[in-house]
From Swiss-Prot:
PANTHER family found in the cross-reference section: CATALASE (PTHR11465), CATALASE-1 (PTHR11465:SF39)
Name of protein: Catalase-1
PROSITE patterns the record matches: CATALASE_1 (PS00437), CATALASE_2 (PS00438), CATALASE_3 (PS51402)
A GO CC term assigned to this protein in UniProt: plant-type cell wall
Active site: 65, 138
Gene that this polypeptide is encoded by: CAT1
Residues engaged in binding heme: 348
Complexes and interactors: Homotetramer and heterotetramer. At least six or seven isozymes are produced from a mixture of 3 gene products. Interacts with NCA1. Interacts with LSD1.
Family: Belongs to the catalase family.
């Protein structure tokens, strides 16, 4: 008998209860005791196994994006962009690729309300014929910091106080008072967009700058954007309190129920592309993740559509164990020198190895659907069946060979080794432009939210003054409004 034919792929392979090793269980209701009321015997292995399994059901929580919901579907190319990339899954209109998408809140714990003011994760795993491509982004097109060196401290500041386990504005405002590049992100977070109505009615963005490489080896910088076909809807502060009080999993339920009812969520994928030779023409660094690219100069180009038409089969297997990593790219798509992206390449995979073990890519939800071969083997929880005798490369006894070289672009690296800030920070222009693009009511709601945050008792006068100075440099009238309501003399 082939033991792999009956591997435990389902909880219902047997018509009766068994132990993990397959032995029949004739009583799953009572412990083995000495007499009717005597002590439990250690030889009740089924009881011990049951308790031991229960004690180990939970795995380490994601340090960020712990609260999430997943769904499956497909991505279909609608527009030809082969002049930009040689990626096989983008080879022409009509090509479909299976995907799984995970939406999430960023900072708060697993089980926290989905109505909190927090960025939302928007991560897509494409199961392509050339391996998995993970586009791991958020609902906002920018980020808090531009250098991954600051990421651990940033998360610590946004997370609850380690003493009280309470998220507090004074910690957040203190940390980011040292990082004026965060203003642009706060112009999204404290805006009406800060609390999406649900996952179906929010945008997505790749956030980082990647590179598209065509068959000739020509490279372009690229930004990815997801636009929901059903429009953007958000919750007001009052609506968030009401909705969250009624159901703390409202967005997960909305996603699940919509798909179950055949109301499949859809997004259109757009790209912005920039010739690296033109990057010096802008007053910002295109590799700065705190900046958007102006659409009037670098317009959105349509690529395809994302359709989620199937709910996941098991929440733990396909939501908790799913592992995304920006390092997973395919030929035709590559990393830029975006400092945040460069650090994410390591950090995400390292986090998954901690959460799920070194063989996390063997889990069905993470494994590629195409043929794959390498000499990575053994390690904890390695369940891939392998019977080869040659586990080294190269070998005259193993026909495996290198893949054909795919197009790459030559990149010349030169300069001194140094730790420094980027040349064109320009921290205040874009958040100011964004604020001025709103109507007066929307501006007022933003001011009210930021005044409330700055009014927390432990926010010092110095921190308030710094933030007023920052916002004044973005927009003088905004700084004046904050100063007046906080009774702080502005230092223009």
């Amino acid at each position: 008998m082939d033991p792999y034919r009956v591997r435990p792929s389902s909880a219902h392979d047997s018509p009766f209860f068994t132990t993990n090793s397959g032995a029949p269980v004739w009583n799953n209701n009572s412990s083995l005791t000495v007499g009717t009321r005597g002590p439990i015997l250690l030889e009740d292995y089924h009881l011990l196994e049951k308790l031991a399994n229960f004690d180990r059901e939970r795995i380490p929580e994601r340090v960020v994006h712990a609260r999430g919901a997943s769904a499956k579907g497909f991505f279909e190319v609608t527009h030809d962009i082969t002049q930009l990339t040689s990626a096989d899954f983008l080879r022409g209109p009509g090509v479909q690729t299976p995907v799984i998408v995970r939406f999430s809140t960023v900072i708060h714990e697993r089980g926290s309300p989905e109505t909190l003011r927090d960025p939302r994760g928007f991560a897509v795993k494409f199961y392509t014929r050339e391996g998995n491509f993970d586009l791991v982004g958020n609902n906002f097109p920018v980020f808090f910091v531009r250098d991954g060196m600051k990421f651990p401290d940033m998360v610590h500041a946004l997370k609850p106080n380690p003493k009280s386990h309470i998220q507090e504005n004074w910690r957040i405002l203190d940390f980011f008072s040292h990082h004026p590049e965060s203003l642009h992100m706060f112009s999204f977070l404290f805006d009406d967009l800060g609390i999406p109505q649900d996952y179906r009615h929010m945008e997505g963005a790749g956030v980082n700058t990647y590179m598209l490489i065509n068959k000739a080896g020509k490279a372009h910088y690229v930004k990815f954007h997801w636009k929901p076909t059903c429009g953007i809807k958000c919750l007001s502060d009052e609506e968030a309190i009401r909705v969250g009080g009624a159901n703390h999993s409202h967005a997960t339920k909305d996603l699940y129920d919509s798909i179950a009812a055949g109301n499949y969520p859809q997004w259109n994928l757009f790209v912005q592309v920039m010739d690296p030779a033109h990057e010096d023409k802008f007053d910002f660094d295109p590799l700065d993740v705190t900046k958007i690219w102006p659409e009037d100069i670098l317009p959105l180009q349509p690529v395809g559509r994302l359709v989620l038409n199937k709910n996941i089969d098991n929440f733990f297997n396909e939501n908790e164990q799913i592992a995304f990593c920006p390092a997973l790219v395919v030929p035709g798509i590559h990393y830029s020198d975006d400092k945040l992206l460069q650090t994410r390449i390591f950090s995400y995979a390292d986090s998954q190895r901690h959460r799920l073990g070194p063989n996390y890519l063997q889990l069905p939800v993470n494994a590629p659907k195409c043929a794959h071969h390498n000499n990575h083997h053994d390690g904890f929880m390695n369940f891939m069946h392998r019977d080869e005798e040659v586990n080294y490369f190269p070998s005259r006894l193993d026909p495996v060979r290198h893949a054909e070289k795919y197009p790459t672009t030559p990149i010349v690296c030169s300069g001194n080794r140094e730790k420094c800030f980027i040349g064109k920070e320009n921290n205040f222009k874009q958040p100011g432009e964004r604020y001025r693009s709103w109507d007066s009511d929307r501006q007022e709601r933003f001011v009210k939210r930021f005044v409330e945050a700055l009014s927390e008792p432990r926010v010092t006068h110095e921190i308030r003054s710094i933030w007023i100075s920052y916002w004044s440099q973005a927009d003088k009238s905004l700084g004046q409004k904050l100063a007046t309501r906080l009774n702080v003399r502005p230092n223009f």
